[in-house]
C-alpha cells in the first residue's frame, strides 16, 4: 500500500484524507479531533447537523463511541453478523463522542468495513475514521483518485492511492433498535 504511512501521519496531524471504500472514495479524519472534523465539513461543504459515519476495521475499534448496552443481545448479534461488510448501522452513541460526529442525532452511524485498504488505514491509525463520500455536496461521488483530485485537489486532502471495491450502490443503512432499513444498499 503505497502511501499508508503518509495517510496515517496526516490523520495524526489532524488532516483530512480521501480513501477508497467498497463503492466510492470517502473522505475522513480523526473522529476525536474537533478541528479535523471542522476541516472535513468545510472541505465537503457539509452541514454539521448531518453527522458523519465512523468506519472501522473491527467492532472493538467502535466501542469507545457506541453504547451497545442500550441494545438487546439479539440486536448486537444481528449487527455483528453483518460485519465486516457494506452495512452501516445507526446505534446508540456514548456521550463522550464529539457532537460534530453525531450531528443533530442522539445516535451514531457506524460500519466495520471489509475493504482491505480501509481496514489497513484504521488498523495503522488504531481507531476508526469518519467516512462520508469524497465529493463536494451536490456532485457525484468519486470512484477514482483522478476524480478525487478533480473535485478536492485544491483542498489539502491527502489521498490514499487505492482502488474502490465493486459496489455500485451506497452501503445499506439500518437502525439497530428497530431493524428498519433507512437506505437500501
From Swiss-Prot:
Q: InterPro entries of this UniProt entry?
A: DHBP_synth_RibB-like_a/b_dom, Sua5-like_dom, TC-AMP_synthase, TC-AMP_synthase_SUA5
**Any GO molecular function:** L-threonylcarbamoyladenylate synthase
Q: Which GO BP terms apply?
A: regulation of translational fidelity; tRNA threonylcarbamoyladenosine modification
Chain ranges of the YrdC-like domain: 1-185
Record EC number: 2.7.7.87
Looking at its record, which EC class is this enzyme? transferase
Q: GO terms for CC?
A: cytoplasm
Assigned keywords, A-Z: ATP-binding, Cytoplasm, Nucleotide-binding, Nucleotidyltransferase, Transferase, tRNA processing
Q: Where in the cell is it found?
A: Cytoplasm
Q: What is its main location?
A: cytoplasm
Reaction catalysed?
Answer: L-threonine + hydrogencarbonate + ATP = L-threonylcarbamoyladenylate + diphosphate + H2O
- Organism superkingdom: Bacteria
- Asked if the Swiss-Prot or TrEMBL record annotates the protein with the keyword Nucleotide-binding, the reply is yes
Task: Tell me, in a sentence or two, what this protein's role is.
Answer: Required for the formation of a threonylcarbamoyl group on adenosine at position 37 (t(6)A37) in tRNAs that read codons beginning with adenine. Catalyzes the conversion of L-threonine, HCO(3)(-)/CO(2) and ATP to give threonylcarbamoyl-AMP (TC-AMP) as the acyladenylate intermediate, with the release of diphosphate.
Q: Which family does it belong to?
A: Belongs to the SUA5 family. TsaC subfamily.
Stored HAMAP family: TsaC
The name this protein goes by in its record: Threonylcarbamoyl-AMP synthase
What's the encoding gene here?
A: tsaC
Amino acid at each position: 500500500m503505497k502511501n499508508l504511512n503518509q495517510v496515517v501521519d496526516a490523520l495524526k496531524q489532524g488532516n483530512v484524507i480521501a480513501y477508497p471504500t467498497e463503492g466510492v472514495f470517502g473522505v475522513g479524519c480523526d473522529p476525536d479531533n474537533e478541528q479535523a472534523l471542522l476541516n472535513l465539513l468545510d472541505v465537503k461543504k457539509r452541514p454539521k447537523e448531518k453527522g458523519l459515519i465512523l468506519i472501522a476495521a473491527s467492532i472493538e475499534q467502535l466501542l469507545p463511541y457506541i453504547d451497545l448496552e442500550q441494545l438487546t443481545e439479539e440486536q448486537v448479534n444481528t449487527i455483528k453478523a453483518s460485519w465486516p461488510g457494506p452495512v452501516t448501522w445507526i446505534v446508540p452513541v456514548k456521550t463522550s463522542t464529539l457532537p460534530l460526529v453525531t450531528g443533530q442525532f442522539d445516535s451514531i452511524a457506524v460500519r466495520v468495513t471489509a475493504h482491505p485498504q480501509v481496514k489497513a488505514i484504521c488498523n495503522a491509525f488504531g481507531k476508526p475514521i469518519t467516512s462520508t463520500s469524497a465529493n463536494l455536496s451536490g456532485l457525484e461521488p468519486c470512484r477514482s483518485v483522478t476524480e478525487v483530485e478533480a473535485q478536492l485537489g485544491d483542498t489539502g486532502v491527502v489521498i490514499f492511492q487505492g482502488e474502490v471495491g465493486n459496489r455500485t450502490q451506497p452501503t445499506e443503512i439500518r437502525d439497530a433498535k428497530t431493524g428498519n432499513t433507512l437506505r437500501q444498499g
